[in-house]
């Protein structure tokens, strides 16, 4: 009653209260907008904007200090491309309010520890770099920053830790030095020399078995593919030699030097790196992607050399822009093209190199592949007079280096290039690539052109490809995507099952029931069964052939027709695929019908897995079967296999998630029961949930067993075919390094790299059963390289 009366009597008061509570929210939103947008397009200078914003924030500190702290920590972590802008802002605030500066430093250290514990190492790097830049702004005392770096480098002395842990701490130090190296050397040169000596000693004894599995190209010319720490070390060494002078970092705090140098500084608290645990997941090592040098951009500004720190700073800033804005291509493209100091560098070349560097990054790109495609299209629209030419030059370079390019990266190049062409009327000067026509069709260049045309056909239609590509390329044209029905021609009437296929086709057209179709199929003799074998066997290849050929031919009009046919006759498919041989033969027949239409094969296999007509292991066995050997290096085959693995992984994850959610529900029930002793029903409610958990636990174990078996099948098949090749070459005194061998070995690497997080669970099994010491070193090295990624 009292609540209702209060509401009734004070309607006006309540509205007034709502306004009062909304005002702080409006002010907080305004503060967030002001901070996040500082340094963007404005009629006044950056310096005056920063000074004005510092004044606004200082005035709001009494009421909104915690909110301001939270926003500044947020931008330090998630807007690294504007780091020096925000470090200057913090410097100005510290000069006006010393206590706030101290609280901000403490908050940043807390954030850093939390970020490391959450395995968010890329964000942690930005926090370390931000702290180091605060030394330049007279917020943090240089000796305490040096002490933090010493504790970071001390991690290299820890025992029984993976190398990737030490790598990250060394990288965090080295990657901060372009910003703060000069200041630290002026104040603490002896200590800094000691830190760099420790880093040098560590880098010399690091194992680098992982490098070759991460390289885009196997050749070191024209540009070496350097390991990321080695490259950064060379850049820092050159920077030190140049007395820490660089010309590409925006340093707005220099304009406020007279104000900032009067400010009191803070000492960082002693920092102990969080210890290594079983849950720690460190960043995978990288190889620095290099595509251009100063000779490729002869006009305009000169591109910095690969070992100049300016190259690192520019690339790092462009990567930061991609990381911050990748979800919105228009904003991302605009931010890239409005890069500060863009007139001092060949910006388009840097942008294209950085984007391709991310697209080709191994094991996986930072973002989905299609993001890079749409971003490059947007950049071409914004810079139609210059960027398309740089992109064409890059495409030409990639094509000329296909022979030494990693097969995984060739796949990504095919996907990007075909998608890009589809947005520009498929315009390309194909005659420039006519050199591929004189090569063996199994070589990378003709294979690349063939797969690009295949992909372009998916994005248009067959006749369009024939119209736009010169007739001289006819050997690489995609086949006309029509089905091959072996029972459709009367000249094949002598084929076993021909008459049944004709009958079956008519009955399906007349909407026969499953029972009627079963009756027709049961009369088909089994070629695997002897006349005197009364028991018979369940697997009848001819029965499968007649049914699948006839049905897929009738449903050949479109993907939708094919899907409807699989759904309508699902029970018959299930009956025919009871055995492993049956599943395998269904896949063989589907391939025979649609061998001229790889996309149809891919979507049919996908649908058959989803509807459980075939299982994932059957698909793996089919891919490695002799019938598919002539298509083994084709793009679509690996598209199917990786799609199959992803489905299996998602299936396991889905059941694991169900199990976790059910366990959480049970835990909540227990908590509720403990707080309510009189609830007699709660004990009875536990029963069904506990039974459900038991069932889900069994399902998880079964699914994980299937998953492990799938990887065992795949790796076993790889080992078999690679071993056969190696033995054949050794016996015949033939060179091992054929185009097929390169492709096959790199496809094995691809399985490891694309599914590395899942495969990590089964490392012991793989090492004990398959990748043993007795295995040929050509194959075993791939496994060892994979292990080195997290060692």
From Swiss-Prot:
PANTHER family noted in UniProt: CAP BINDING PROTEIN, NUCLEAR CAP-BINDING PROTEIN SUBUNIT 1
Subunit-structure text: Component of the nuclear cap-binding complex (CBC), a heterodimer composed of ncbp1/cbp80 and ncbp2/cbp20 that interacts with m7GpppG-capped RNA. Component of an alternative nuclear cap-binding complex (CBC) composed of ncbp1/cbp80 and ncbp3.
Family: Belongs to the NCBP1 family.
Record-annotated MIF4G domain positions: 28-240
SMART domains noted in UniProt: MIF4G
Chief location of this protein within or outside the cell: nucleus
Ranges where the record places region Disordered: 1-24, 664-687
One Pfam family hit: MIF4G_like_2
One of the GO BP terms on file: regulation of translation
A GO CC term attached to the entry: nuclear cap binding complex
Protein purpose: Component of the cap-binding complex (CBC), which binds cotranscriptionally to the 5'-cap of pre-mRNAs and is involved in various processes such as pre-mRNA splicing, translation regulation, nonsense-mediated mRNA decay, RNA-mediated gene silencing (RNAi) by microRNAs (miRNAs) and mRNA export. The CBC complex is involved in mRNA export from the nucleus, leading to the recruitment of the mRNA export machinery to the 5'-end of mRNA and to mRNA export in a 5' to 3' direction through the nuclear pore.
Name this protein carries in UniProt: Nuclear cap-binding protein subunit 1-A
Compartments (UniProt record): Nucleus; Cytoplasm
Coiled coil ranges: 641-714
Lineage: superkingdom: Eukaryota
Keywords noted in UniProt: Coiled coil, Cytoplasm, mRNA capping, mRNA processing, mRNA splicing, mRNA transport, Nonsense-mediated mRNA decay, Nucleus, RNA-binding, RNA-mediated gene silencing, Translation regulation, Transport
Species whose genome carries this gene: Xenopus laevis
GO molecular function terms attached to this record: mRNA binding; RNA cap binding
